[in-house]
């Protein structure tokens, strides 16, 4: 395994461990534990949630192990820089308005005897007894990071994408301009839609938008979509195309159905291209950071741009570029 790939894998495990405890675990400690237990964030998270014993910080042996581990040091420096940058941004906005782990970093006996895990369990267990904290421990023990899939769209770069993000941190960064965005509002989403006709009970899929009606392929009734579906890579597989050509009541639809609705726009890529309109139908709101969250496992931080795919593939990001443009 190359040193760069090793750093990526270590970073992913550290981000996952910290996300399970909402960023309450220090970066140094998280990196040390992931090196010690071969990036097994599931096991470590479970033991932290179960532990309640003494209280201590990193001892000299642990600190020496990190100092002699270049991979761990690089990950620590990167994550700390991200955290510091986030804190500086928050403070500014408020004021204005290949080496492996060293021998000492290897696992010490069992997790139940690990002082670092014990210390974390003790410190986290004295948190106030709230529903949110209880939910955090329950989810950590069950190896869960609650997440949802959302559509994002960058107006300045004219691109849209789908991403699975934590429920507590619904934000995604555009890979081109690096700006952070909130999800497209649910009532403004567009793309491959799923329809259920209340008149003929027909179920079908086609391009649509949540705030616009499309004709049923069966009875031609004008109906709203039930939901917008994330594109699937399997749509790129060769095979017969759908029998029904796209058609809607939008004024500028390339295959318009009458009576059309004046002033409405078609979201089908053919119509957008024919009418020389931007790809993005409704842009994401710009994300305003509260400074209350950290860059964790499902955030868009990466070692370098070319390494992004390793992390994105791991969390199954799906881009509209991967979808079939026909309906």
Curated annotation (Swiss-Prot):
Output compositional bias ranges, type Low complexity: 93-105
- Pfam families, sorted: UPF0515
Q: Which InterPro entries match?
A: SHFL
Region annotated Disordered, chain positions: 82-121
For this UniProt entry, the molecular function terms from Gene Ontology, in alphabetical order, are: ribosome binding; RNA binding; sequence-specific mRNA binding
Its GO biological process annotations read:
innate immune response; negative regulation of translational frameshifting; regulation of translational termination; response to interferon-beta; viral translational frameshifting
Where are the compositionally biased (Basic and acidic residues) regions?
82-91
Q: Looking at the keywords, is Ribonucleoprotein present?
A: no
Record-level GO cellular component terms: cytoplasm; nucleus; P-body
What are the entry keywords? Cytoplasm, Nucleus, RNA-binding
Q: Where is this motif: Nuclear export signal?
A: 304-312
Q: Where is it mainly found?
A: cytoplasm
Location of motif Nuclear localization signal in this chain is 163-179
Domain of life, per UniProt, equals Eukaryota
Where does the record say this protein resides?
Cytoplasm; Nucleus; Cytoplasm, P-body
- Cited function: Inhibits programmed -1 ribosomal frameshifting (-1PRF) of a variety of mRNAs from viruses and cellular genes. Interacts with the -1PRF signal of target mRNA and translating ribosomes and causes premature translation termination at the frameshifting site. May exhibit antiviral activity.
Please state which protein family the record places this protein in.
Answer: Belongs to the SHFL family.
Q: What is this protein called?
A: Shiftless antiviral inhibitor of ribosomal frameshifting protein homolog
Q: Which organism is it from?
A: Danio rerio
| Source species taxonomy | Eukaryota, Metazoa, Chordata, Craniata, Vertebrata
